[in-house]
A protein has these predicted regions:
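Bacterial Sec-dependent N-terminal signal peptides
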Residues: 1-23
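A short C-terminal boundary segment appended to hydrolase-like catalytic domains
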Residues: 287-387
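Acidic, metal/ion-coordinating pockets
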Residues: 21-307, 349-355, 359-361
Length: 397
């Protein structure tokens, strides 16, 4: 009888030992991209409620963190510093207070960010100040300091979650010189994404030995050469041609995408893009099975999630109510009066008071001899009456 009890006890211990060596880890990866200043669920230009925003995104994040706790990884993929007066005000008007964007992202507890071309377009004084006040690293493996030949920003971030090592590699579209004047990015250069990815993947594998590698790329998937030499949207090329990535989070092109592709090594890579303005977010579930601390299998599933369905975070709105009121006052300030309404529509057929105004302003402000301007919108209108400072929308590339 004692012998039988001993055997059962031994078997029980063996089962416990095996169970202790095997482990399942579940991660939730959330990507935002191309938020374009849509921090609040309100469009300060149209003066209407907005479907997207960080306020709605945070409501989703709060709910998911109840389940995933620290295993939720929150990442931003750039182009967050331009698009609404909220960004403009803290970029150029109030440069003394902490930048609203970094305050919000710190409050939301982002794990890493990435640079986008519209962030670069704000100028080094703005984006360097923003980066300095972020509690998380803003990445840029292919943004090179020309004086040192080294990345101006951290190339990647290592995250440890529940015994799993995750590496996030950040890159930006290298086509910046095709759009932006050098005075905005003086002292920097933007290297090819695929070449940069090969270099850093080798370093990451040798130095970090990660269990999961995420590409955080401010670039779309339709590759073509800008100005004959800049491969603007190389995310798909990197996913396919540089083995090692499990997930590639995309941005820049404002195009929704979620699919798996096969790389040259025969491995599956999830590529996903949440488009723009915080209307949807990239929602990725990763399940890893570990044995003796080593990953035996990975299951990666992604979907695009509409943020409107999750409502607006009351905590977020309460925390940033004073800044909301500050921006409202700014955009409500009268800066002039139009005695007649003007529209872009006539510009497509002949003389246009709207385009004449743009030419006059460009010539007067810059001192240029010649002004070029395009209507861009077919039927944009400035109506007769007072003009408010909400006209400051963006500094478009």
């Amino acid at each position: 009888m004692k012998r039988i009890g001993f055997i059962y006890g031994l078997l029980f211990c063996l089962v416990l030992s095996v169970a202790a060596q095997e482990k399942v880890v579940k991660l939730k990866i959330v990507e935002t991209s191309d938020v374009h200043g849509n921090y609040y669920p309100y469009n300060f230009i149209t003066r209407h409620e907005w479907k997207g925003s960080l306020a709605r995104i945070y409501s989703f994040v709060q709910k998911e963190r109840e389940q995933y706790k620290e295993n939720l990884i929150l990442l931003d993929n750039g182009d967050i510093l331009q698009g609404q007066p909220t960004a403009y005000y803290y970029n150029y008007i109030d440069t003394v207070s902490p930048h609203l964007c970094s305050e919000m992202m710190n409050f939301m507890k982002y794990d890493a960010g990435n640079m986008g071309n519209h962030d670069v377009e704000t100028g080094r004084a703005v984006f360097d100040r923003w980066i300095a006040t972020c509690d998380f690293p803003v990445l840029g493996a292919n943004i090179i300091d020309t004086s040192t030949g080294k990345p101006h920003l951290a190339p990647y971030k290592v995250l440890e979650r529940d015994g799993v090592k995750i590496v996030v590699l950040g890159m930006i579209t290298p086509a910046i010189p095709a759009w932006l004047s050098e005075n905005l990015w003086k002292g920097l250069r933007f290297d090819d994404m695929e070449e940069t990815a090969r270099k850093w993947m080798r370093i990451i594998r040798e130095k970090e030995n990660p269990d999961l590698v995420i590409g955080l790329f401010h670039a779309g998937q339709e590759a073509f050469k800008m100005s004959g030499k800049y491969n603007e949207n190389a995310s798909l090329n990197v996913a396919k041609n540089v083995p090692g990535f499990d997930i590639v989070l995309m941005g820049h092109d404002h195009a929704r995408e979620c699919k798996k592709v096969m790389n040259v090594a025969g491995d599956s890579v999830l590529i996903i893009d949440p488009a723009s303005n915080g209307i949807v977010l990239s929602n990725v579930d990763v399940t890893l099975k570990l044995k003796d601390g080593k990953v035996q299998s990975k299951d990666i599933k992604g979907e695009l999630t509409e943020t409107e369905a999750y409502g607006i975070s009351e905590d977020f709105m309460k925390r940033f109510a004073p800044q909301y009121e500050t921006v409202q006052k700014f955009v409500s300030k009268k800066i002039g009066t139009f005695t007649e309404s003007i529209s872009t529509h006539p510009a497509f057929f002949g003389p246009s008071a709207f385009i004449d105004l743009i030419h006059t302003l460009q010539l007067d402000i810059t001192g240029a001899d010649i002004s070029f301007a395009a209507p861009l919108s077919f039927d944009a209108e400035i109506k007769k009456g007072d003009v408010l400072s909400l006209i400051h929308i963006s500094e478009p590339t």
